[in-house]
Amino acid sequence: MVQIVCTLLLFMVIIFPIGNYVYHVSVGKRTFADPVFDKMDNFVFRILKIDTSTMTWKKYAMSLLMVNLCLVFIGYLILRIQSIGFLNPNGISGMEESLSFNTIISFMTNTNLQHYAGESGLSYLSQMLVIIMMMFTSAATGFSACIAMIRGLLGKKMGNFYVDFIRIINRFLLPLSMIIGLFLVWQGVPQNLNSNIELTTIEGKIQEIASGPIAALESIKHLGTNGGGFLGANSATPLENPTIITNIIELFSMMILPVSCIFVFGRMAYDKHEESKANNRVYTLSTKNCNRANKVWIGKEGRTIFVAMSILFVIGLGVCFWSESLGNHAVAQAGITETFGNMEGKEVRFGVAQSALFTTVTTSFTTGTINNMHDTLTPLGGLVPLMHMMLNVVFGGAGVGLMNMLIYAIIAVFICGLMIGRTPEYLGKKIEGKEMKLAALCIIIHPLLILGFSALAVSIPEGVNGITNPSFHGLSQVLYEFASSAANNGSGFEGLLDNSLFWNMSCGIVMFLARYLPIIIQLGIAGSLMNKIDINESTGTLKTNTLTFAIILVIVVYIFAALTFLPAIALGPVAEMLTL
């Protein structure tokens, strides 16, 4: 437990300056690196002949979709023809059609679900031009959509997708990925273009040690909340995650961007509040107050969202760590003492504490990378990552986690408004029927995809044939696969035989719909609120920047999760726990 607390406290120290930097990048304020990055941005704008004028929400959404679809087409072709000799020293053959479809949708949507093993399924050309490239673009897509939604909610113009997309890559993802990659190389992560190394084991058998540009992929894999591994065992293997230092670096990397989005939201909401005061002549922004404004890190609105997400995260982390520390009841009944907790499927160099933390972080921040085998978690320990993916608001992936939580905030405001008999307002905007219909549609998509496709999988032979575990754990595998796909997470209970036509196509469809339908709806809500006149705050206005509202938000999230997922969870992880 001490390891977990120290790790999280250290993260809180570094996130404040990083969050402040991301805020400056997002709103176009000056930073120390502008002399370099301004030239990079302008060069890209000039070469691609990009019109940097502001867009409507419809044009923003259409631009986002078109860029992603173009990248999918290019990536799919490369996966199919990767057998060419260029950057393919290990002689990897072209990828099969349905697996290519699943893979390219997976990485385009920031899911990184892998129905293949990277060391035997992809050439270096595919790893670099498809996988690593998609890891940058998918993270930038989610972040750009989030910033556009925040602008709309606050009554500002939506901005320009191409500008947001290029700025976050040039000014944040690329430079920080390079720094993280160098740290990983320092700790022993390979970075080369050599073929796999053949060696003879002490048993006299031939074994291949994977090689390649692992550090380059590993850095953006976590920073962009992607999660797909260069190797099949992902960050559980020493080639991707050799030491406790790399483990902490990877933990911090996948937490940085989602938390920074909350900082951006809080600061932008604070800026709007101060502008509103100045415009109403109620408040004069003196030099002293300007200095105070510069010292605001996250703002009250951002703090409320952060507290709500943190409560959800800490509850899940506590349950996972407690369950794994107790060990496996079935193993204890066999007379085996588990002094260090449930170590099945875990790396000794990390132990239960770092494994439980990594598991909770990777499914809360929807990264999907693993440093232990989730299929070997205890039933209650495995319920935590499953539940966090079903919630899909516990910080979430780059940008989209905050977008989902803001939808819940709108719903919470609406419910509270009904209870006190007032018109619901959020961030100074009146929430009316149109916004509520869109918000309800947005949150129902996630459970509908998970439960609908899970029901289909256990109803037809093509789905049942992939289930390798009987009874309750088999259902948990199916639920986990589709929850991971719908949450754009990518981790899995790897006992599932998922490289088949049914699983490749069904998961691909779920990933695509779960990624783009909510984003379009969320941008639509932001576009609707953007055009509304601000409402002045009164004594009867529900304050959304308090601890009380944070607790209300947590309760609303849990109630919705219970109403939608509790029956399925009771038949899976809960039933498995009760029968051990």
Say what each PLM segment does.
Residues 1-580:
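Membrane-proximal intracellular helices of multi-pass ion channels
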